[in-house]
UniProtKB/Swiss-Prot annotation:
Signal sequence region: none
Entry-linked PANTHER family: REGULATORY PROTEIN RECX FAMILY PROTEIN (PTHR33602:SF1)
Lineage summary: Bacteria, Bacillati, Bacillota, Bacilli, Bacillales
Superkingdom assignment: Bacteria
Job of this protein: Modulates RecA activity.
Protein name in UniProt: Regulatory protein RecX
One record GO biological process: regulation of DNA repair
UniProt keywords, alphabetically: Cytoplasm
Length: 263
C-alpha cells in the first residue's frame, strides 16, 4: 500500500493541499478534509481509504459551492440542487450536501417561501395565483405554499389590486370606461389576483369617466381612427371609424354625436 510522502499547499488556494503518494502527486483535498482524515506524511493509505477521502473532498467542494450560491440570496432546496447539477455534481454528493445545509440551517423551504412571497408581494405587487405558480416552480410543496399564502388576506389582496388600478387610471387617461375596466381586469389577472378580488377591487374604484372625460377619450381615439381609415364623410369610411370606436367601448350615441360635429 502507498504511503503519503509529501503534502504541499496549493499556490492559488491555500485552503487546498496536494497529496503525494510514493513521491508522486495523487490528489488534492480541502483543509477540512485533511484534518478530518488525519492525513500526514508517512500515513499509509489503501484503495478504499483513497476513495473515501476523495468522496469527502467532493462533498466539501460541493458544500462550499452551495454556500457561495446561497450567499447572494435565500434559495429553495430545488434551486440549490439544480445549481449543483449544472456543475455536474453526482446525485449522492448533492444529497449529502443538502442534508448538511439543513443541519446548518442554511436551507429552510418554509422560511424561503415566506420571504419570497413577502418580497414579491411588496415590490412587484404580485397576487396569490402568480406567487403559487412561482413557488411551485421553485420546488416548494403545495401545503407549504398554501400555508404561506394564507397570510395574504382577502383585504390585503384588494388593497394591492387597488394600487394597480390606481396606476392604470393615472397613466391611461384617454380610455373609455369599458377600456379602463378591461385593462384593469387583464392587468390584475396577469399579476395573479383571483376573480373575486378583482371584482371587489373594481367595485371599490371610481373608474367611470364623467361625460366630459368620456368625450375627451373618444376624441383622442377618433382622431386616430380618422387618420387610420382616411375618414372623408363617406358611409364606408364612417362605418369603419364607428366600428373601431365601438370596439374601444364608446357608445353609439357618443360616436354619432362626435362624427356629426366633425362633418
Amino acid at each position: 500500500m502507498p504511503f503519503i510522502t509529501k503534502i504541499s499547499t496549493q499556490k492559488k488556494n491555500t485552503e487546498r493541499f496536494n497529496i503525494f503518494l510514493d513521491e508522486k502527486y495523487a490528489f488534492s483535498v480541502d483543509a477540512d478534509v485533511l484534518v478530518r482524515f488525519d492525513l500526514k506524511k508517512g500515513k499509509e493509505l489503501d484503495e478504499l481509504d483513497i476513495l473515501e477521502i476523495q468522496y469527502g473532498d467532493d462533498v466539501k467542494k460541493a458544500f462550499n459551492r452551495a454556500v457561495e450560491f446561497l450567499s447572494y440570496r435565500m434559495r429553495s432546496e430545488k434551486e440549490v440542487r439544480d445549481h449543483l447539477k449544472k456543475k455536474e455534481t453526482p446525485d449522492m454528493v448533492i444529497s449529502e450536501v443538502i442534508h448538511k445545509l439543513y443541519d446548518y440551517r442554511y436551507l429552510n423551504d418554509k422560511e424561503f417561501a415566506e420571504a419570497y412571497a413577502s418580497t414579491h408581494k411588496k415590490t412587484n405587487g404580485k397576487g396569490p395565483d402568480v406567487l403559487f405558480r412561482e413557488l411551485k416552480a421553485k420546488g416548494i410543496d403545495d401545503d407549504t405554499i398554501k400555508e404561506t399564502l394564507s397570510a395574504f388576506t382577502f383585504d390585503e389582496q384588494i388593497q394591492e389590486a387597488l394600487k394597480h388600478i390606481g396606476k392604470i387610471l393615472k397613466k391611461d387617461k384617454k380610455l373609455s370606461t369599458k377600456e379602463i375596466r378591461q385593462r384593469a381586469q387583464m392587468q390584475l389577472q396577469r399579476k395573479g389576483f383571483p376573480f373575486d378580488v378583482i371584482n371587489a377591487a373594481l367595485e371599490q374604484t371610481e373608474y367611470e369617466n364623467d361625460d366630459e372625460a368620456e368625450m375627451e377619450a373618444l376624441k383622442a381615439h377618433a382622431e386616430k381612427a380618422i387618420r387610420k381609415y382616411r375618414y372623408d364623410g363617406s358611409y364606408e369610411s364612417g362605418m369603419k371609424v364607428k366600428q373601431y370606436l365601438f370596439r374601444k367601448g364608446f357608445s353609439i350615441d357618443d360616436i354619432d354625436q362626435f362624427l356629426q360635429e366633425e362633418e
